[in-house]
A protein has these predicted regions:
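Aromatic/hydrophobic beta-strand junction motif of beta-rich domains
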Residues: 74-78, 151-155, 194
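Solvent-exposed loop/turn segments flanking beta-strands in beta-repeat/beta-sandwich domains
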Residues: 155-169, 176-177
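Beta-strand-rich modules
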Residues: 198-212
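Alpha-helical transmembrane segments and their helix-helix packing motifs
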Residues: 216-217
Length: 227
């Protein structure tokens, strides 16, 4: 039997017919009409009938260059005007307010969880968005001669690592040696010098990395460097 036939009905065979959204209790009875060794019993279950929910997000941007304190709106909404709640997996990278505005706090990765609760008409729904906040560098200069490549990185994100990779060409299929890495400590400039005397042609790629997230890469604007 159903406690609320306006929501759903159930027949003698246990087939449920849904009428509209809401909540109803179904009671299942075993009357022991066959006079077996089993006692009569009943079981009651609660059935919730809900419309499918979806969470829409206006802002599609999920990667940001690090600038502490920058605020952005996620622009999320749910069907039926259901209230949304927000949480961040890493508030040290991105914090999120009750109104859905994120604030950049540091460099790294954070997952923002958006939840629409069950309001009696629409089902509960959860959506997760992964954000990346990239380390930055204000400028990069490349100088070279027949023997050395000198890379100067200005204002890299503190405590990041400056990385210089030297490839055979702009196709970036073959890497010459290991990456050249220097940790950013104090000061606003990092200089890395690479011995390129053995290479007749090469292609440098420069970027910074922190907490597993890489900055945008800088390359030689004129393509391969040839001697």
């Amino acid at each position: 039997t159903s406690s609320n036939e306006n929501v759903l009905k159930v027949n003698d065979r246990g087939v449920i017919t849904v009428t509209k959204t809401g909540t109803a209790k179904i009671t299942i009875c075993a009357n022991n009409k066959t006079k077996s060794n089993y006692k009569p019993c009943s079981k009651t279950i609660t059935v919730k009938v809900r419309k499918p929910q979806s969470i829409q997000v206006k802002s599609k941007k999920t990667q940001y260059n690090y600038k502490k304190g920058v605020k952005r709106s996620i622009g999320a909404s749910a069907k039926g005007g259901v209230r949304l709640t927000y949480s961040s997996s890493n508030p040290k990278v991105i914090s999120v307010a009750n109104n859905g505005k994120i604030t950049i706090k540091g460099v790294g990765k954070a997952i923002v969880t958006i939840k629409a609760g069950d309001n009696g008409v629409y089902e509960q729904k959860v959506r997760k968005i992964t954000y990346y906040v990239r380390p930055v560098m204000s400028s990069v200069s490349i100088a070279h001669n027949s023997k050395t490549l000198k890379v100067t990185v200005n204002n890299p994100t503190p405590n990041s690592k400056v990385i210089v990779k030297v490839y055979e060409s702009s196709k970036m299929k073959k890497l010459y040696g290991k990456p050249h890495i220097k940790t950013v400590k104090k000061g606003k400039k990092v200089v890395i010098t690479v011995n390129v005397s053995k290479y007749s042609r090469y292609y440098p790629v420069i970027y910074v990395k922190k907490n597993g997230v890489e900055s945008q890469k800088v390359t030689n604007s004129r393509g391969d460097i040839r001697k």
